[in-house]
A protein has these predicted regions:
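N-terminal pre-catalytic segment of deacetylase/amide-hydrolase enzymes
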Residues: 1-46, 51-61, 65, 178
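Metal-dependent polysaccharide deacetylase catalytic core of the NodB/CE4 family, i.e.
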Residues: 40-43, 53-55, 59-199
Length: 199
């Protein structure tokens, strides 16, 4: 979604109206969350977590300190290599969601291939003792209508974002103050914020 001044909600390009038809969303657009001055102020913190480099636990610590919850879209690598973190996410009230097992472009896959990929991640989390929430985020944000329909057929809702902070490149990060200012400048009621616990 494009940045919208005045902290109003952005709107997706009309070509992507099928997102909603496929059970997907990128913003909380319920009436109480559509106005910048609405009574309810809400943002959703979502994290694409593929691997651990020492920051996932720090993010969990910060969320605990702030008494905040998030949704973690995890990959098979994190679930298999760090089952303790998957268990901690669930134990501390966060959603453990499906980001696929191997983080590959799924846009042209068959429905059976998609179902197998979702199940593979579910199984990895289940081995860690955690059931995944029925929310999916496509790897790299790449999607097609056929992918979203296949995901919906497996009982999932696809979660996109209304603001994605470019934090995946560890070598190109601004100062904490500049990062905070950028995020606050782009906040809007009902925002779904995409973050990565790698930087």
């Amino acid at each position: 979604c494009a940045h919208v001044r005045g902290h109003m909600q952005p709107r997706a390009d009309g070509r992507f109206a099928f997102i909603r038809d496929c059970g997907g969303f990128y913003i909380d657009d319920r009436p109480e969350h559509t106005a910048a001055d609405g009574a309810d102020k809400v943002v959703y913190l979502t994290f694409d977590a593929g691997y651990e480099n020492g920051n996932v636990a720090r993010v969990l610590d910060a969320l605990a300190q702030a008494d905040a919850a998030g949704a973690f879209f995890v990959l098979g690598n994190l679930a298999r290599q760090n089952p303790d973190l998957i268990r901690r996410m669930a134990a501390e009230g966060h959603l453990v969601c499906n980001h696929s097992y191997a983080h590959r472009d799924m846009t042209s896959w068959s429905a059976d291939e998609i179902a197998a990929e979702l199940t593979r991640l579910e199984d990895a989390c289940r081995e860690a003792g955690v059931e995944t929430a029925k929310f999916f985020r496509p790897p790299e944000g790449r999607f097609s209508e056929s992918l979203l329909r296949a995901v919906m057929a497996q009982g999932y809702r696809t979660v996109f974002w209304s603001f994605g902070y470019a934090d995946w490149d560890n070598d190109r990060q601004p100062s904490p103050a500049a990062a905070k200012a950028k995020i606050l400048d782009n906040l809007h009621n009902g925002a779904v914020i995409l973050l990565h616990p790698t930087s």
